[in-house]
Regions:
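Active-site-proximal cap/loop segments of hydrolase catalytic domains
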Residues: 465-654
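Cap/lid segment of the alpha/beta-hydrolase catalytic domain
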Residues: 387-506, 513, 547
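Non-catalytic accessory segments flanking enzyme active sites
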Residues: 16-19, 156-160, 165-166, 170-178, ...
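Predominantly five- to eight-bladed beta-propeller fold
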Residues: 43, 128-180, 225-230, 278-281, ...
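Multi-bladed beta-propeller domains
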Residues: 1-14, 47-63, 85-87, 94-110, ...
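Blade-terminus and WD-like Trp-Asp/Gly-His loop motifs, strongest in beta-propeller folds
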Residues: 19-26, 64-72, 114-120, 202-210, ...
Length: 654
């Protein structure tokens, strides 16, 4: 068997956005792949029809698409190129029976979504920029004024609201999404939603007479991004907008689905703060009355961690009045259905269903099953694509050995990967990998970095401590960071060492990112059992995180279970920086300079404290990267990151 190489993630092809045609005779999806030489990702559209799979496009930048009709796909692209600064968006159409893609629509603003209408017109979700709200009209003078203003003020940032930046972007500058109507004959856009309100979660009714959407007032200093969004609808004949249902503290709307005879609302009662899972409610289309439909209290969608995904797709869909949805339960994500107020499993296997579509009783699921990267499967669970067979052929893929234990009054679930060429009685070093979130899970899925370490001769252990997803109230860790979760992790580490005497307790290493980075920082201040640690995109100080993260004020107070004023001492007690003078473990810190979720100052603080106390430390910073470095960062940066962590552990082996 050959080992998994450090750059083997570049050989993985990631699938996403699987979508049936209107009549269900074909399906389109995206396939993405990292390109090490060009240090980028390429994405193409693929077609599944009559049991055959073939590439539909070859430009390498196609990811956003929809069906125009049964035989034509519309996708976003830029095949013309721009000689001057431009906000223009272009969409192309391509026939499924062959031929080249043709330019179909050109919009004067950035467009993220289009919804084709039967009359040939479109609904369009596009960007609005404060002070230049009429850019959608295509006035060249206004476009020039926008870019002149941008250039004149490029040395300044004027901040007037929270948050002022978002991870993966830059300073928000107040830009937001609006809903427009596109007249195909006139080639013109008409604004449907008022300026100053951000549109999201747009869904078009099956009869195309009404469009539903969530709306958030972004004209205020602190928009309620985490307070749920109000649901509205517009009658397309009259263009009249109507409030459907409002969010409130005990009814925080996460999303919704359009059924045949009722609208299904997924909303949380806030019992466990901002991470509270949803229950289901029925909303009458005529009266707008809301009634409870089903108590659920589990996660909608997959929160199973993985580093070989690229792209998204549908996590739920109504078929008549039956909701099909992905849900994270325990250590995996499967497909379930809600019918007549009762939830039941549809297709649940070890691993993760990442997205799906359903049409005329047929289903296609994009899933991480059988310790393989993503493939498509049908409604019976039969695999229908083989994109990653060649990548895995002849390679050692460690199979997860489940390890569950009782810690206090609850169970902790986890897994162990054995090193390549494992021999009983021989000693092997161990890497303990801690997930982020904390409301996510590790599961039995193909995880490149873990497989790479197993191929290099390490045991890899990982688990889901208190605070993890998939078990209802188990995820409630508000005000308890560094207590029960730390105890769970140490208990799991002890249990793993007890199960496999081949694990070398003198060569025990630990790493984690985001919440896992917080926990790494906490661990080194509370135990010396690890020979070396690597803290990635971490939190070290809740009192400063409050003011620098894009989610700081909301997330820090929610997770610390208090308000920073007057309870600053509680925030400090839960901060790893408080215990930095206790650290003896050699620690590597990795941060991305454009990570605004766990900003780089968190790494600076911990690194400075350790160096000041004479602890061996190293800080590695990545330009042009954000919080997603390990999952979707530039390929060469991902390789450097993994080399840094692995090299740090190799350097400190006893």
């Amino acid at each position: 068997m050959k080992p998994i190489a450090i750059d083997d993630f570049c050989a993985v092809r990631s699938l996403a956005n699987v979508t049936f045609s209107p009549e269900g005779t074909s399906a389109c999806f995206t396939v993405s792949q990292a390109k090490k030489e060009k240090n980028c990702y390429k994405s193409r559209l693929y077609l599944l029809k009559g049991g055959r799979v073939r590439a539909l496009t070859g430009g390498g930048k196609e990811s956003s698409f929809c069906y125009l009709d049964e035989n034509t796909v519309l996708f976003a692209g830029d095949r013309e190129g721009e000689k001057e600064p431009s906000l223009t968006s272009r969409f192309y159409k391509i026939a499924l029976d062959g031929g080249e893609a043709d330019l179909a629509y050109t919009f004067p603003i950035p467009v993220s979504q289009v919804f084709p209408l039967k009359n040939g017109d479109l609904l369009v979700v596009g960007s609005t920029f404060p002070g230049f709200e009429d850019l959608y009209k295509g006035d060249k003078k206004l476009v020039k004024a926008y870019f002149d203003d941008k250039k004149e003020n490029e040395d300044y940032e004027v901040i007037s609201q929270l948050p002022w930046w978002w991870n993966g972007g830059t300073y928000t500058r107040g830009a937001y999404e609006s809903l427009f109507y596109y007249d195909a004959k006139k080639k013109s856009l008409t604004r449907l939603t008022d300026a100053g309100f951000n549109v999201s979660d747009v869904q078009l009714a099956e009869d195309q007479k009404t469009v539903y959407f969530s709306l958030l007032d972004v004209s205020v200093p602190r928009p309620a991004h985490f307070g749920g969004q109000d649901l509205y609808r517009i009658d397309l004949a009259s263009r009249r907008q109507k409030l459907v249902v409002k969010s409130r503290p005990d009814f925080v709307i996460a999303t919704y689905a359009l059924g045949k005879s009722f609208l299904l609302v997924m909303a949380a009662d806030g019992k466990f703060g901002m991470n509270t899972d949803c229950d289901f409610y029925k909303l009458d289309y005529e009266t707008l009355a809301v009634t409870p439909y089903a108590v659920y209290g589990e996660a909608i969608g997959s929160s199973v961690g993985c580093d070989v995904r690229h792209g998204g797709g549908q996590a739920f869909k109504m078929d008549g009045d039956v909701l099909y949805f992905i849900s994270t339960r325990f250590d995996g994500a499967g497909l379930y259905k809600l019918e007549d107020g009762t939830v039941s499993p549809v297709l649940v296997r070890d691993g993760s269903v990442d997205c799906f579509d359903r049409k005329n009783g047929k289903m296609l699921l994009c899933a991480l099953w059988d310790m393989k990267p993503q493939e498509l499967y049908d409604e019976t669970g039969r695999r229908v694509t083989h994109f990653n067979d060649a990548m895995l052929r002849g390679k050692y893929v460690a199979q997860p050995d489940p390890l569950n234990l009782t810690a206090g009054d609850h169970e902790v679930h986890g897994f162990i990967l054995k090193p390549m060429d494992f021999e009983a009685g021989k000693k092997y070093p161990v890497i303990f990998d801690i997930h982020g979130g904390p409301k996510t899970v590790y599961g039995p899925v193909f995880y490149h970095e873990m497989q790479y370490w197993a191929s290099r001769g390490y045991f890899v252990i990982f688990c889901n401590p208190t605070g993890s997803d998939g078990r209802g109230a188990f995820m409630d860790i508000r005000g308890k960071y560094g207590t029960v979760d730390f105890d769970d992790l140490m208990a799991f580490c002890d249990a793993a060492l007890a199960k496999y005497p081949e694990m070398d307790a003198d060569n025990l290493f630990e790493t984690g990112g985001s919440y896992g980075g917080f926990m790494t920082n906490w661990i080194i201040g509370h135990t010396d059992r690890f020979r070396a640690c690597a803290s990635q995109r971490s939190i070290s100080n809740w009192t400063s995180f409050y003011g620098v993260s894009d989610i700081g004020p909301d997330f820090s107070e929610d997770q610390c279970g208090s308000t920073i004023w007057p309870d600053v001492e509680k925030f400090w007690w839960h901060s790893p920086m408080k215990y930095a003078d206790k650290v003896k473990t050699p620690t590597l810190f990795l941060h991305s300079l454009e990570d605004y979720r766990c900003p780089v100052d968190q790494g600076y603080q911990m690194y400075s404290a350790l160096v000041a106390h004479g602890v061996e430390s190293r800080l590695v910073l990545f330009r042009g990267e954000n919080h997603e470095l390990s999952r979707s960062g530039k390929p060469k940066h991902r390789i450097r990151r993994l080399n840094e962590i692995t090299g740090w552990f190799e350097q400190h082996k006893g």
